[in-house]
């Protein structure tokens, strides 16, 4: 899978993603990340890409031309017009289901805004998906873009060592993940649940499922209610 990030800070993107699991996946060729510097498409001798907003107001707005020209260059290089995710607090809140949908694409473009935003005409021309990682404002779209890429990349075949891990983590089935334990079995009097030491796989799976439900009900009642609606037979 190929990610293309349109940004004013390409080093921030690459430094953040060239480590850990995503870094390993990039080095192995399972996925690629290219940070496209929007400033490279400015016709200003100082590579300026912003200007004052029409109608007045605080801050600056990113101009349409550099953004659109950057996108068209990506289209030219990959040979098609891919989906474009614009990271914005005004977008739909990012979820695991959205990540699963995006993971079906061969190419994804992620647009990172800055200043007071981007000229609306650029957004109308190229953006297909408006996505937010939460109801708060950051200084730019780079950190949200990395969150989105990290989440999607875990669903790309070959990125994770254990193919099952992406399927059993929190949210994959609408529930939070069950508690995890490792050695020693006794840590200062705190014991690992006996069922996990039993070797009885059916009982272990039953325990894990029950704990996932308990944890979801306690920490994410909204998800719990949704799960109950979809699995009403389980609670009769």
UniProtKB/Swiss-Prot annotation:
Main location: cytoplasm
Protein EC: 2.1.1.228
The reaction(s) this protein catalyses: guanosine(37) in tRNA + S-adenosyl-L-methionine = N(1)-methylguanosine(37) in tRNA + S-adenosyl-L-homocysteine + H(+)
Disulfide linkage: none
Highest taxon listed in the record's lineage: Bacteria
Family: Belongs to the RNA methyltransferase TrmD family.
HAMAP family xrefs: TrmD (MF_00605)
PANTHER family assigned: TRNA (GUANINE-N(1)-)-METHYLTRANSFERASE
Subunit architecture: Homodimer.
Protein name: tRNA (guanine-N(1)-)-methyltransferase
Recorded name of the encoding gene: trmD
């Amino acid at each position: 899978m190929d990610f293309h990030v349109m940004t004013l800070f390409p080093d921030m993107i690459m430094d953040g993603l060239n480590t850990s699991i995503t870094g390993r996946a990039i080095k192995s060729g399972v996925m690629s990340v290219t940070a496209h510097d929007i400033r490279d498409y400015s016709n200003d001798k100082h590579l300026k890409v912003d200007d004052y907003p029409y109608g007045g107001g605080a801050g600056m707005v990113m101009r349409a031309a550099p953004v659109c020209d950057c996108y068209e260059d990506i289209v030219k290089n990959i040979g098609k017009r891919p989906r474009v995710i614009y990271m914005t607090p005004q977008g739909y809140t990012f979820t695991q289901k959205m990540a699963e949908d995006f993971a079906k694409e061969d190419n994804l473009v992620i647009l990172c805004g800055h200043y007071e935003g981007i000229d609306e005409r650029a957004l109308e021309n190229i953006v297909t998906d408006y996505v937010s990682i939460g109801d708060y404002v950051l200084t730019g779209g780079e950190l949200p873009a990395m969150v989105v890429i990290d989440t999607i990349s875990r669903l790309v075949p070959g990125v994770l060592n254990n193919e099952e891990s992406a399927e059993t983590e929190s949210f994959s089935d609408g529930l939070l993940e069950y508690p995890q334990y490792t050695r020693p079995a006794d840590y200062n009097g705190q014991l690992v649940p006996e069922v996990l030491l039993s070797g009885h796989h059916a009982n272990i799976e039953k325990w894990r499922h029950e704990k996932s439900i308990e944890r979801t009900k306690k920490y994410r009642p909204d998800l719990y209610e949704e799960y109950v609606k979809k699995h009403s037979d389980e609670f009769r």
